[in-house]
A protein has these predicted regions:
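N-terminal accessory interaction module
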Residues: 13-148
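Short glycine-rich, Thr/Ser-proximal phosphate-binding strand/loop in the N-terminal lobe
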Residues: 37-39, 46-72, 167-207, 236-243
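Flexible, charged surface loops at secondary-structure boundaries
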Residues: 40-43, 86-93, 156-158, 214-217, ...
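Short, Lys/Arg-enriched N-terminal segments with co-localized hydrophobic residues
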Residues: 1-9
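Short, well-ordered amphipathic alpha-helical segments that serve as non-catalytic structural scaffolds
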Residues: 82-83, 199-215
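Glycine-rich phosphate-binding loop and adjoining helix at the ATP-binding site
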Residues: 69-79, 87-91, 102-139, 188-203, ...
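Short glycine-aspartate micro-motif
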Residues: 95-97, 160-166, 219-223, 271, ...
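Long, contiguous juxta-domain segments that are non-catalytic but functionally important
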Residues: 145-163
Length: 294
């Protein structure tokens, strides 16, 4: 959402003006107007951005900017900063590589830093999710890495004796399955949000798994889902653990599923992902299709 003199400079007139927020302009209209303005200016220049992670994952974006002078500076900065913020939340990463405009790189570095106006994103996306603060670097186009996003095969396994669970804000759902047939299912009420002791969560998760295991001759694999950002079965942040200190999350709860796998479940396959991914998986299995949004 964009307002003030930047809208006036772009001369955008939405078809519908919100009564309670007459200055509101949908970002898509602003972006379209900016891109048309840049395309019409022969002095426009290209900027290339790569958003990367420590594991080598890389997402690329390219676009044209207006000559970086006068009133165009505010327009260019608004356009790129909004694009970068969207990419951080859509794709995810902690290193921003900028080629083609050093002034834009400097602007991003001054905003995505401690004390900058995007300090929250700098800390949350960078430190909490990807392990280190967001960093902005100036590079040449030749130095930008190629786009790379490793794919991961998720689930669709029904054979054998398996446990599935979901951690919610009001209850823990757990089921035992034998060759695709549910032999046990239970929802156990719990209150995780403001519990300060990590052991409360650990004991609750293990309790649900043991209840399900009691209905199986053996346990071949465990799969689970939870609210929050979960990468490689490790919790980076989750509303379920909001009462637990960041120190305890990093020390204990972040790797709770790996710890349970090793200490309680003999290192059998034990995978946990975000609950939206499991919803997408269920939809994909039901429709016998791929690329389903959960």
């Amino acid at each position: 959402m964009l307002r003030s003199q930047r809208i006036i400079a772009m001369n955008i007139q939405p078809k519908i003006t919100p009564v309670l927020d007459p200055g509101f302009v949908p970002a898509v209209l602003w972006n379209q107007a900016f891109e048309a303005k840049a395309a019409a200016d022969p002095a426009s220049h290209q900027v290339d951005i790569a958003l990367t992670r420590n594991d080598g994952t890389c997402f690329r974006w390219s676009g044209k900017l207006l000559p970086h002078t006068g009133e165009n500076i505010a327009l260019n900065e608004t356009y790129v900063e909004r694009i970068v913020k969207f990419l951080l939340w859509q794709k995810g990463g902690n290193i921003i590589l900028v080629a083609g405009d050093d002034a834009i790189a400097d602007m991003l570095a001054s905003r995505y830093c401690k004390g900058g106006i995007r300090e929250f994103d700098w800390d949350f996306i960078g430190k909490k999710i990807y392990g280190s603060p967001i960093e902005v670097k100036k590079v040449s186009v030749e130095e930008l890495p190629e786009e790379y996003s490793g794919s991961m095969t998720l689930g669709r396994n029904l054979d054998g004796c398996r446990i599935g669970f979901d951690l919610g804000g009001s209850d823990r759902k757990c089921a035992a399955v034998v060759n695709g047939e549910v032999v046990y299912s239970e929802e156990v009420v719990w209150d995780p949000y403001f519990q300060k002791d990590p052991q409360y969560h650990i004991d609750g998760i293990q309790d649900s798994l043991e209840r399900a295991a009691a209905h199986l001759p053996r346990v071949d694999a465990i799969g689970g889902s939870s609210a929050g950002v979960i990468i490689n079965s490790e919790v980076r942040t989750s509303s379920l653990f909001r009462g637990v200190s960041q120190e305890d999350i990093e020390k204990t709860l972040g790797k709770v599923f790996r710890t349970l796998q090793k200490e309680k479940w003999n290192n059998i396959p034990f995978e946990v992902v975000n609950d939206g991914e499991v919803t997408a998986l269920a939809g994909a299995m039901g429709m016998n299709d791929n690329a389903v949004l959960g």
